[in-house]
Amino acid sequence: MISLKSIVDKLYNLEDLSYQESYQLFDYFIKGQIELPLQTSILTALKLKKETSIEIAAAVEALFDNTKEFPKIKGDLAGIVGTGGDGFNTINISTTAAIVAATAGYKVAKHGGRSVSSKSGSFDLLESFGVNIELAPDQTKQCLELYNLGFLFVPFYSDGFRHIKEARTILKTRTIFNILGPLINPARPNKVVIGVYSKDLILPMAKTLVNLGIDRAVVVYGSGLDEVAIHDDTYVAEIQNNQIIEYKVSPVDFGIDTYAIKDLEGGLPEQNREIIKQILLGKGKEAHNAAVAVNVAMLMKLYDKDDLKQNTQEVLEIIKSGKCFNILQQVINYSNK
């Protein structure tokens, strides 16, 4: 076993960790074997050094090895998630996009937790809707099979995350756990859209996904947002056959107007719930509908639907039909049986 001291010394010298060292470090983290002051120092050192794709992949495996197993789903399974930490406090776009994608017929396992840095995390929102977020894995699997949608509350699958909650709250800044968050979906989807909070993270995240053996994925950075943007360009790294292709898209590529970031500003869970409810009922504002639609359109690309304009129009029609709220309501009812 590698000693914690030797790992910490390397980090203090801003040296990269080996796969084994990073695995051991995050095994210590998740088992609560690192004191709070040292946790904050380690997370700060990693951030200053900049995390490598090897360190991230090793950390993911360490976290998975300390997580409850989720039953395997037959066929394709999608995930759509952001790192958080972009600082804009937008409405919960990835959560809404997951519900809309499920309505469109794609199986989506949405994982996450309560808010650390924003006003309302994805599961703060879901709880405000009345979703029972602590559903047993076999029940969540059945929910996925019935309604194409399942919510996986990460702390329910690994109570070790409580050991790092205080350090993250104290630091009030983005840490490697923002990067790890999107990668630790217990359902292990094979098609994922991941939004990152920094352009510098696009390639490390994409390389990590290749290292983890993900089938198809896109990593996106939306000019300040950790999702596909409707206010400016979105930088993309797409993964297919272990290859990474980088490109850029703009609102015009999706056939939509350009909007301002402030058009997407969210609030407390109760305020967000009302905004999201209106979107799902087909009564949302144009900017809100567009933001959700472009993110689902990007997910559809992973299913060989390459025409982003056509994808976006299809999704907008589904949103405006009001059917999306029915799916959420069925999941709420199922989760509270």
Curated annotation (Swiss-Prot):
The keyword Amino-acid biosynthesis applies. InterPro entries: Anthranilate_Pribosyl_Tfrase, Glycosyl_Trfase_fam3, Glycosyl_Trfase_fam3_N_dom, Glycosyl_Trfase_fam3_N_dom_sf, Nuc_phospho_transferase. Keywords: Amino-acid biosynthesis, Aromatic amino acid biosynthesis, Glycosyltransferase, Magnesium, Metal-binding, Transferase, Tryptophan biosynthesis. 5-phospho-alpha-D-ribose 1-diphosphate binds at residues 82, 85-86, 90, 92-95, 110-118, 122. It holds the Pfam family Glycos_transf_3. Pathway: Amino-acid biosynthesis; L-tryptophan biosynthesis; L-tryptophan from chorismate: step 2/5. Anthranilate 2 binds at R168. GO terms for molecular function: anthranilate phosphoribosyltransferase activity; magnesium ion binding. GO terms for cellular component: cytosol. SUPFAM superfamilies: Nucleoside phosphorylase/phosphoribosyltransferase catalytic domain, Nucleoside phosphorylase/phosphoribosyltransferase N-terminal domain. The keyword Magnesium applies. Its cofactor is Mg(2+). Mg(2+) 2 binds at D226, E227. Its EC number is 2.4.2.18. Catalyzes the transfer of the phosphoribosyl group of 5-phosphorylribose-1-pyrophosphate (PRPP) to anthranilate to yield N-(5'-phosphoribosyl)-anthranilate (PRA). NCBIfam families: trpD. Homodimer. This is Anthranilate phosphoribosyltransferase. The lineage of its organism: Bacteria, Pseudomonadati, Pseudomonadota, Gammaproteobacteria, Thiotrichales. The gene is trpD.
